[in-house]
Amino acid sequence: MGFEIGNHTETHASLPELSVEAQREEITATSERVEAIIGERPRFFRAPFGQNTEASREIAEEAGMELMNWTYGYDWESEYQNAPALADIMVNTEYLNHGANLLMHDRACTRDASAQIVEGLRDKGYALVDPETIASSEKEAAQ
């Protein structure tokens, strides 16, 4: 399993605070930059702070991207910025359920907790899947 490169905007701005045109620029500039680097446009969009707007949803759809939001995450909270605490909460939170999409940032504590998180999830019977699998499952459920 490799990594899917998605669109998370150019500057991580709070989209509800931006005009429609500014939201469009945030989203399209990122897709263009990703395409210039890897040769393909992102297929998924995740709004900063999970704050989608009607405009951001429409812009993402026009660009052929699916929304890929998260279920829960803790690595941005100071009490979980150490590997043991982060691994414990990520595996034992009440928000863990079938289809959960875990929010994990590129931080040292997250890197250091990753193996424990994966092991803990697998021990509970969960499997790691790529974003395409999640998107396909959501489409099937909506039908």
Q: Where do the protein language model's features map onto the residues?
A:
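Alpha-helical scaffold elements within enzyme catalytic domains, especially in hydrolases
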Residues: 1, 59, 119-120
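Mid-chain, structured segments of secreted extracytoplasmic proteins
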Residues: 1-2, 13
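Structural recognition of the beta-strand scaffold that forms the well-ordered cores
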Residues: 4-7, 43-46, 66-70, 100-104, ...
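Active-site beta-loop-alpha junctions enriched in small/polar residues
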Residues: 10, 48-50, 72-74, 105-107, ...
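Alpha-helical scaffold elements lining the catalytic groove of polysaccharide deacetylases
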Residues: 13-41, 51-98, 110-116
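C-terminal domain-boundary segment and adjacent tail
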Residues: 109-143
